């Protein structure tokens, strides 16, 4: 499940690959952005169970040390980065994207296919263009691995996110249930099929 930003507004950001040194910051960002975006949908116990399991330090360490996965963090350049490079490393990230091998439950998924697994932006930056920047970086990284297709899951009621992904060439391919505690969300699976010429 992921949520993008929409139309770029020319706000400067610094984006870089995450490392194990970013573990605590990534955990805080992951918990905060998921709760801001989807927390209202769930009973408190279901939400807490999901946050503790999905965004535990162990789970995030596994992602950051997996060579098949990549996480990028974005920082507001007005807070840290361009004007003070040292401040960038102490400021809190404002968005992130996670890419890796596809694990969605669809019969057409093939070994080597890629997935945009998470894309989240802090509240207040939803129209900054940051989601599109992160999406482009993650897609390019996945394309370097020459997959047959790219995939992602998106909440069935998130029309805005679906339109965003359509602009990146993703189309509806199926449905599944996304587990949050005892709750099951109705999710769409979207796919971007790739021709050989586009993978070169």
Regions found by a protein language model. Name each.
Residues 3, 8, 13, 17-20, ...:
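Acetyl-CoA-dependent GNAT
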Residues 22-25, 130:
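Terminal low-complexity, poorly structured segments
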Residues 110-114, 148-162, 166-200:
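C-terminal "cap" of GNAT-fold acetyltransferases
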């Amino acid at each position: 499940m992921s949520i993008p930003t929409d139309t770029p507004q020319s706000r400067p950001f610094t984006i870089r690959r995450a490392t194990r040194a970013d573990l605590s910051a990534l955990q805080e960002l992951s918990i905060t952005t998921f709760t801001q975006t989807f927390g209202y949908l769930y009973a408190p116990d279901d939400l807490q169970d999901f946050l503790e399991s999905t965004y535990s330090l162990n789970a995030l360490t596994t992602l950051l040390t997996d060579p098949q996965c990549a996480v990028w963090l974005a920082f507001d350049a007005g807070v840290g980065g361009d004007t003070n490079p040292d401040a960038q490393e102490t400021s809190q990230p404002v968005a992130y994207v996670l890419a890796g091998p596809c694990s969605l439950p669809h019969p057409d998924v093939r070994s080597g296919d890629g997935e945009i697994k998470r894309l989240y932006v802090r509240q207040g930056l939803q129209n900054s263009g940051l989601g599109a920047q992160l999406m482009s970086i993650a897609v390019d990284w996945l394309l370097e691995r020459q997959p047959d297709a790219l995939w992602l899951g998106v909440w069935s009621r998130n029309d805005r996110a679906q339109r965003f992904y359509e602009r990146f060439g993703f189309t509806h391919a199926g449905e599944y249930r996304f587990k949050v505690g005892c709750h099951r969300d109705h999710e769409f699976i979207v796919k971007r099929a790739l021709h050989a010429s586009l993978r070169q």
